[in-house]
Regions:
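Acidic, polar-rich low-complexity tracts and alpha-helical solenoid repeat scaffolds
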Residues: 1-240
Length: 240
């Protein structure tokens, strides 16, 4: 118990290397005891903090009386990645979330892992890397992450001039968004994309929606008036 207490003190002082040595001594020296299982549990927390879940699994498997279930390993792997994300350790979080997605393709936290990984890539201005992970979120059942994923997917697709794909996502965003600004963003870009595709009736329809919205900023209204005028010229309908 004294050795276990020593390890806990070292852990609380962030002396993780010393704590792991103490916990290992307890786990190896006093197998199958309550103290040994507490040492294993505390070691698990340290390995998660360090983002070294694989090392934890190898260590536990070396103990004849203990084992790590797939469910526990999955949970620990996700927790390790999420901790690095919350601590703003971008590179380490990216590595660990990628590891989780590869190791647990049917994992319970797969949606969160894809979304957080997308956010990390997006903030690092790696939009091409972020895109497939946002698209994964968009393809799943509606969640708290869907609207953000739709918004950023459309943004990335528009920037890369993938207008056909962007149109599909913008239509969803216009329908599903709860944030009025996101709906306005969707309608503004639907106006522009439809004009680009020579669907002038649709372009005018979205322009008129924008103009009827009292929250629309003046520069967006200016775009709408221009689209209506150009679309009217294209359709020989100067009365618009």
């Amino acid at each position: 118990k004294a050795l276990l207490r020593k390890g806990l003190i070292e852990y609380n002082q962030n002396n993780t290397t010393a704590a792991l040595i103490s916990f290992n001594t307890v786990a190896v020296g006093y197998p199958s005891t309550a103290e040994a299982f507490q040492a294993i549990s505390s070691s698990r927390s340290i390995y998660i903090d360090l983002g070294q879940v694989d090392s934890y699994a190898i260590w536990v498997k070396s103990l004849d009386y203990a084992r790590v279930t797939d469910s526990e390993l999955e949970s620990a792997t996700y927790q390790a990645a999420e901790k690095q994300y919350l601590d703003s350790n971008t590179n380490k979080a990216i590595k660990l979330f990628n590891g989780y997605i590869v190791s647990f393709p049917n994992g319970k936290q797969l949606l969160k892992a894809h979304f957080y990984l997308a956010e990390l890539y997006y903030k690092a201005t790696l939009s091409a890397n972020a895109l497939p992970h946002y698209q994964y979120v968009c393809s799943q059942a509606p969640s708290e992450f869907t609207e953000t994923a739709l918004f950023k997917t459309s943004e990335i697709l528009l920037e890369s001039e993938a207008f056909d794909e962007a149109l599909v996502i913008l239509l969803r965003l216009d329908t599903e968004a709860r944030n009025p600004q996101n709906r306005l963003y969707a309608q503004s870009n639907l106006m522009k994309v439809n004009f680009r595709f020579n669907d002038f009736d649709a372009a005018i329809r979205y322009a008129e929606m924008i103009l009827k919205n009292s929250k629309t900023e003046s520069y967006i209204k200016s775009d709408a008036y221009i689209i209506i005028a150009r679309a009217a010229m294209q359709t020989n309908n100067e009365m618009k």
